[in-house]
Amino acid sequence: MGGISIWQLLIIAVIIVLLFGTKKLRGVGSDLGSAVKGFKKAISEDEPAKEAKKDADFVPQNLEKKEAETVEKQKQNDKEQA
């Protein structure tokens, strides 16, 4: 009906095993698995660096707000004293 049936996939798998052999297929599978594992590890190591950058962005803004509040308080105190 236009789609690939399970029997066709099974026949293709048998032909691939006969052509390449099980040792080469195991080697390719393990290489592919280690590549995926390395990719996932690299992605997970990259995410904390992005979070650290976000945290670093918030710290200076808070300091600027505190400094601005301190300056405003000093101005109010100066006005009250004068």
UniProtKB/Swiss-Prot annotation:
The keyword Transport applies. GO terms for cellular component: TAT protein transport complex. Its main location: membrane. InterPro entries: TatA/B/E (IPR003369), TatA/E (IPR006312). GO terms for molecular function: protein transmembrane transporter activity. Residues 48-82 are annotated as: Disordered. Keywords: Cell inner membrane, Cell membrane, Membrane, Protein transport, Translocation, Transmembrane, Transmembrane helix, Transport. It is a single-pass membrane protein. Pfam families: TatA_B_E. One of its GO terms (biological process) is protein transport by the Tat complex. The chain crosses the membrane at residues 1-21. It comes from the Bacteria. Gene3D superfamilies: 1.20.5.3310. It is found in: Cell inner membrane. PANTHER family: SEC-INDEPENDENT PROTEIN TRANSLOCASE PROTEIN TATA. The Tat system comprises two distinct complexes: a TatABC complex, containing multiple copies of TatA, TatB and TatC subunits, and a separate TatA complex, containing only TatA subunits. Substrates initially bind to the TatABC complex, which probably triggers association of the separate TatA complex to form the active translocon. Part of the twin-arginine translocation (Tat) system that transports large folded proteins containing a characteristic twin-arginine motif in their signal peptide across membranes. TatA could form the protein-conducting channel of the Tat system. Belongs to the TatA/E family. NCBIfam families: PRK02958.1 (NF002813), PRK04598.1 (NF003396), tatAE (TIGR01411). This is Sec-independent protein translocase protein TatA. The gene is tatA.
